Curated annotation (Swiss-Prot):
The modification Phosphoserine is found at S120, S164, S374, S377. It comes from Saccharomyces cerevisiae (strain ATCC 204508 / S288c) (Baker's yeast). This is Transcription factor RLM1. Residues 103-156, 173-192, 202-318, 330-424, 472-514, 532-631 are annotated as: Disordered. Pfam families: SRF-TF. Present with 736 molecules/cell in log phase SD medium.
């Protein structure tokens, strides 16, 4: 079915008339534009609506076109009137809606009229030529749509009375433009705020406006309230005070000169403007004499110096290769033993039997950090030797804690550079246990230090020493200087540092802690739990002989920094479990005594090794030797784990309970880890 043409006559309904006007006006303007473009003609279309509003489309200046229309007599005129299209006639004058003007004095204009004059964008081309039989329905739908937004487009009657028709047209056209541009559709207050300049931007200097392209007034306001003297700082510097800002350097006439003091790298300077509040509080509490730490935002920053310091710190971190020290856990450690948090000191991860010793060690380490000497390694240093005691048994001769530090000449007379910085001169075999600790260690900074030794020479030297020793000939007096240290004694010529055991090449200076003679093959170095006698594997034993009895800490009231290997109570009625052998691979016991220099053993006393009596600590600090009936058979019955032929951690007590493993970052075969 084709379209049915409607009768061209006045539409009686106001809403339908307004909708028809909107659609046909838009189509007329569109056709006029297309005609002007396609045919290169000058067009001016002027419409005076029933709401006393002019609607105009012109491809040229309307006044100029009207001037030529009226005054240029040389231009031809082709005129048409309504009579050319039907039984209509031309009006003699302009029709002004007088009723609308009169009603505007007291009332607003009807919603339909105002709405009808403002919706001219939705018309199409076909509505200009002909109407269809659905015109009535379409007009009703358009009227319903116009009622929703009619209240927003009403013009006050007082304004319509005072404004001229041209002003009314511009006012109605402005409402149409608001629909097209979402920025103009804002509420009046928001639109006014958007047009008004920012007072903070006006008050800022041009230099600050270049630094900050996007205005953030809420950040600036809060920052100015908190820091009135530093209101010129940009919000980026305010939001991230931790990062060094190069913007603040522009406020200085010239940056202060960079002065590198001799102790610059030992205690680097931190610029005040790049400090965090937490760092600032720490510097103020430590009594720093920096004059710029009163307010870290007010003082100007020296960005160049900060960048140099960060570069130096980064290079120092790269040069110091971290080594992870892993300690095997043991369930017999003291529950109140303090775990220190000093990763750069080997003494901080030592096996402390009690919390008092640990706290005292930490205090001593902090006070002596400037001297770079570990208090534990300086308290008792020197090699251990096997000597015959008064009772005819073999004992371990421990170094003298009172001996001053000197060069180690290899004969055991001078006790400098003892390889055990774990606590009071006792090796890890005699130490109590501690919870599982993984601590990064820093290598020693001594040039030509012990970690730069020849690995093949050390391995060959150890093999020769272990071949000379036999498990059955341990009763002989054999100096354990090289056997226990695993290195030539003359290597250490300088004092021990507190940076932990040297790393970087194997074998380490503590590699002997995990090595001892095998019961059957004396030329092969094995783990300490393999050094049990042949009687430990007797068929009558019900328990597996490969493990060790619980290692307990000793009660030592006279010296809080000593690290004991057995936990003997103050009474002399200890059971056999407390009198059993410690983690020494020879099933030996300690003869402990106290001295004023925090040494576990004195120079004049002996420590028994094979079947000797356990020394029992009393509250007075003296020691009493008591006979120990625990032989290999008795010790085997006290063991409750697997045999010593496997070092795996699968029992309650492991022989590796006091051992450390250093895992370096160097991936080079066997050198990627070292046992300490």
């Amino acid at each position: 079915m084709g379209r049915r043409k409607i009768e061209i006559q006045r539409i009686s309904d106001d809403r339908n008339r307004a909708v028809t006007f909107i659609k046909r006006k838009a189509g007329l303007f569109k056709k006029a534009h297309e005609l002007s473009v396609l045919c290169q003609v000058d067009i001016a279309v002027i419409i005076l609506g029933s709401n006393n509003t002019f609607y105009e489309f012109s491809s040229v200046d309307t006044n100029d076109l009207i001037y030529h229309y009226q005054n240029d007599k040389n231009l031809l005129h082709e005129v048409k009137d309504p009579s050319d299209y039907g039984d209509f006639h031309k009006s003699a004058s302009v029709n002004i809606n007088q009723d609308l003007l009169r009603s505007s004095m007291s009332n607003k204009p009807s919603k339909s009229n105002v709405k009808g004059m403002n919706q001219s964008e939705n018309d199409d081309d076909e509505n200009n030529d002909e109407d269809d039989d659905d015109h009535g329905n379409f007009e009703r739908n358009s009227n319903m749509h116009s009622n929703k937004k009619a209240s927003d487009k009403n013009i006050p009657s007082a304004h319509m009375k005072l404004l001229s028709p041209t002003a009314l047209i511009s006012k109605m056209d402005g409402s149409e433009q608001n629909k097209r541009h979402p920025e103009n559709a804002l509420p009046p207050l928001q639109h006014l705020k958007r047009l008004k300049p920012d007072p903070l931007q006006i008050s800022r200097t041009p230099q600050q406006q270049q630094q900050q392209n996007i205005s953030r007034p809420y950040h600036s306001s809060m920052y100015n309230l908190n820091q009135p003297s530093s209101s010129s700082s940009s919000p980026s510097t305010m939001d991230f005070p931790k990062l060094p800002s190069f913007q603040n350097s522009s406020f200085n006439g010239r940056p202060p000169p960079i002065s590198i003091s001799p102790n610059k790298f030992s205690k680097p300077f931190t610029n005040a403007s790049s400090r965090t509040p937490k760092q600032e509080h720490k510097i103020n509490n430590s009594g720093s004499n920096n004059n710029d730490n009163s307010n870290y935002t007010q003082s100007p920053s020296n960005s160049l110096e900060d960048s140099i310091q960060q570069t130096v710190k980064a290079r120092r971190k790269l040069s110091a290769r971290p080594v992870l020290r892993v300690r095997i856990p043991n369930n017999n450690f003291s529950s109140n033993s303090a775990i220190p948090s000093e990763p750069s000191s080997a003494s901080s991860t030592s096996a402390n039997g009690n919390s008092m010793g640990s706290s005292q060690i930490m205090k001593e380490n902090k006070t002596s950090r400037s001297s770079k000497i570990s208090p534990l390694s300086a308290s008792a240093s020197g090699p251990l030797t096997l000597q015959k005691g008064n009772n005819g048994r073999m004992v371990i001769k421990l170094p003298n804690a009172n001996a001053p530090n000197g060069s180690n000449n290899g004969n055991g007379s001078n006790n400098n550079n003892h390889p055990y910085p774990f606590g009071s001169g006792s090796s890890p075999l005699f130490s109590a246990t501690q919870p599982y600790i993984a601590t990064p260690l820093q290598p020693s900074n001594i040039p030509g230090g012990p970690f730069q030794q020849n690995t093949s020479f050390l391995a060959q030297r150890q093999t020769q020493q272990y071949q000379q020793m036999s498990f059955k000939k341990q009763s002989q007096t054999v100096p354990l200087t090289t056997t226990l240290t695993g290195r030539p004694p003359s290597t250490f010529s300088g004092p021990e540092t507190s940076n932990g055991p040297p790393t970087g090449s194997l074998p380490s200076k503590f590699v002997h802690d995990l090595m001892s003679n095998s019961p059957n093959v004396s030329s092969i170095s094995m783990f300490p739990d393999w050094s049990m006698g042949p009687n430990s594997a007797k068929p009558g034993n019900t328990n597996n002989p490969g493990t060790f009895p619980p290692v307990q800490t000793a009660v030592n009231n006279g010296n809080s920094s000593n690290i004991s290997s057995t936990n003997n109570t103050n009474n002399n009625n200890n059971n056999n479990n407390n009198n059993s052998s410690n983690n020494n691979s020879n099933n030996g016991n300690d003869n402990n005594s106290n001295n004023s220099n925090n040494s576990y053993y004195s120079n004049n006393e002996d420590a028994p090794v094979n079947g000797a009596a356990i020394s029992e600590h009393t509250t007075d600090g003296d020691s009493n030797n008591q006979s120990n009936s625990s032989t290999y058979d008795a010790a085997a019955t006290a063991y409750n784990g697997n045999t010593g032929l496997t070092p795996y951690i699968n029992t309650a007590q492991t022989p590796l309970g006091t051992k450390f493993f250093n895992f370096s970052t160097d991936i080079s075969g066997e050198k990627n880890s070292s046992k300490i």
